A protein has these predicted regions:
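Penicillin-recognizing serine hydrolase domain
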Residues: 1-136
Length: 136
């Protein structure tokens, strides 16, 4: 691989780096777990957990994926199954996305280092539009 992670949260570290292919490998492995696929396929995801002090807590995460918040629409004949977003000043706006075509074929798409979130989703839609060209 061509990745080196210094932390689990993904925030900037000068020795923290990855590639689109390595993100694909990680994402491809993660979708084998129903907890992950459930979480990436919803507008919000709530968990209850027991902390080290024995207390139970509930936490809800809300989607930042524009396809789930309604701020972006994928091309025709492309269904967004779910994805993982990430944005830092150094990395830019990033998105790993799992989509499907009308025939049930799955596609992984990854955009990294977009200048803005609007650019990220414009670039992603350009990439996803290739799915329709493949079907011609």
């Amino acid at each position: 691989t061509n990745s080196h992670f210094m932390n689990a949260h993904g925030l900037q570290d000068e020795n923290h780096y990855t590639t689109p292919y390595d993100m694909y490998l990680i994402f491809n492995e993660a979708i084998k777990y129903s907890t992950f696929t459930d979480a990436i396929n919803q507008q919000s995801y709530t968990v209850t957990y027991t902390a080290g002090d024995g207390e139970q807590y509930e936490r809800t995460w809300f989607a930042t994926n524009y396809y789930f918040t309604g701020e972006a629409t994928p091309p025709d004949n492309v269904t967004v199954f779910g994805g993982k977003t990430g944005t830092t000043d150094e990395a830019g706006a990033c998105l790993s996305l799992l989509t499907k075509d009308p025939y049930g074929n799955s596609y992984f798409s990854i955009i990294m280092k977009a200048d803005t979130k609007d650019d990220l989703y414009s670039d992603m839609n350009d990439l996803l539009s290739i799915i329709n060209k493949k079907q011609l």
